[in-house]
Amino acid sequence: MRHYVLSISFAVALFLECYTPSTAISIGKMDDVALEQDTLDSLLSVEVSENSPDSVRGRSSKIVLLADSGLWMNLNRGLPFYKLRAAAAGPDRALTLDRREAGQDLSPSISIVRRDTMRCMVGRVYRPCWEV
């Protein structure tokens, strides 16, 4: 929950930071900015000003997307996506049975119950991913 609140507050801060100068500039200053842009265009060659991207010539709006580990959570149940998928498959498929057959083992018919977990690559080895 803390990560979610932190991400939302950071996104709001960036959003307000991007739009605060555009709302705070008075009309008189906007004319000065346009005059400065015209002066800059006259100093630069026509080719450079035509080939420059729009963000250099005039300010354009930008969309900032923030990713959070909470995005993998289901909002209804609060479960991660891979656990939700295992729960939707049914309780009989959530656990798998493995039988190991070994000739020298004392009891070769012991069944081992393993949970289906998501695997993440850590270095060169796949290890189970734990929830944060």
Swiss-Prot record:
UniProt key word rRNA processing: no
GO BP: chemical synaptic transmission; neuropeptide signaling pathway
InterPro entries tied to this protein: Prepro-melanin_conc_hormone
Keywords per UniProt: Cleavage on pair of basic residues, Disulfide bond, Hormone, Neuropeptide, Signal
GO cellular-component term (any): synapse
Expressed in which tissues: Pituitary gland. Produced in neurons of lateral basal hypothalamus which project both to the brain and to the neural lobe of the pituitary gland from where MCH is released.
Annotated S-S bridges: 120-129
Single GO molecular function: melanin-concentrating hormone activity
Annotated signal sequence range: 1-24
Function, in words: Plays a role in skin pigmentation by antagonizing the action of melanotropin alpha. Induces melanin concentration within the melanophores. May participate in the control of the hypothalamo-pituitary adrenal gland axis by inhibiting the release of ACTH.
Similarity comment: Belongs to the melanin-concentrating hormone family.
UniProt-recorded name of the protein: Pro-MCH 1
Originating organism: Oncorhynchus keta
